[in-house]
Amino acid sequence: MSDLSTLKLFATQPHPCSYLDKQEATTLFVDPEARVDKTLYTQLSQLGFRRSGAHLYRPQCLRCQACVSCRIPVNLFKPTRNQRRCWQKNQDLTLHLVSTIKTPEHYQLYTRYIEERHRDGDMFPPSEDQYNAFLTSEWNLTQYIELRHDGQLIGLSVCDQLGDGLSAVYTFYDPREESRSLGKFAILAQIEKARGLGLDYLYLGYWIKECDKMSYKIQYRPLDLLVNRRWMRLN
C-alpha cells in the first residue's frame, strides 16, 4: 500500500474545461504506480479525489474553484417529495449486484446512452476500450448494480466501496426510460445501499453550480461540501 504522506502527485498542463465554456482546467493525478487500497482511496476521497478508471484525480485550477466535492450523509438524508415519487415509481425494478460489466448487454446499453445523451461530450463516440478504461479498476472495491425491469437491463450504476461510504462513479441507462428518472433513482438506491452496509456517506463527485449536468447534486439534503479543505454541511 502507498502512504498518503509520501504519495506522488502529478499536475496536467492547463486544458479546456469539460464543464464550463471558456475556462481552463488543471487536473491533479495520483501517481499511477501507487498501490491503492481501501484506506488510501478513502483518505483521498475525503480530500476531494475521484476515480476515473484506474486513475484518481482532483481539479487543481488556478483561476476557478467551481468544482466542489460533495457527499450525502446517508443517515441524515431526507428525500424531497419529488425524490419520494421517483422511488415509488421504480419499485417495479429489481436490483442485482454483478461482478463484471464486460458483456455485450452492458456495453450496448452504455453505447445507446452515450450516443443519445452525450454526443457533445468527450466520451463520444463510445468505444469498448474507453468503456472498460473508464468504468473498471483492478482494486477489487468496485460494485456494479444492475437495474432490471421484467428481466431486461435498463440501467447500471458503478460505485466503489470506501471505508466510510460509497463513491458513485457513474450511472447509465436506456434513454427510452427517461420518464423513470433513473439517474435520480440510482442515487436513492445507492443511499439505501450505503445505509445497509453501515456506511456514513455517498460521495457524489463534484457539484458545479454553473453546469446543468452537475448542478443537480444540490437537490440532495443535507449535503456536505468540501470548502477550503473542510467539509461543511448544507441543510
From Swiss-Prot:
Pfam families: ATE_C (PF04377), ATE_N (PF04376)
Superkingdom of source: Bacteria
EC number of this enzyme: 2.3.2.29
Record GO biological process: ubiquitin-dependent protein catabolic process via the N-end rule pathway
Primary localization: cytoplasm
UniProt catalytic activity: N-terminal L-glutamyl-[protein] + L-leucyl-tRNA(Leu) = N-terminal L-leucyl-L-glutamyl-[protein] + tRNA(Leu) + H(+); N-terminal L-aspartyl-[protein] + L-leucyl-tRNA(Leu) = N-terminal L-leucyl-L-aspartyl-[protein] + tRNA(Leu) + H(+)
Sequence similarity: Belongs to the R-transferase family. Bpt subfamily.
Protein name: Aspartate/glutamate leucyltransferase
Species of origin: Cellvibrio japonicus (strain Ueda107) (Pseudomonas fluorescens subsp. cellulosa)
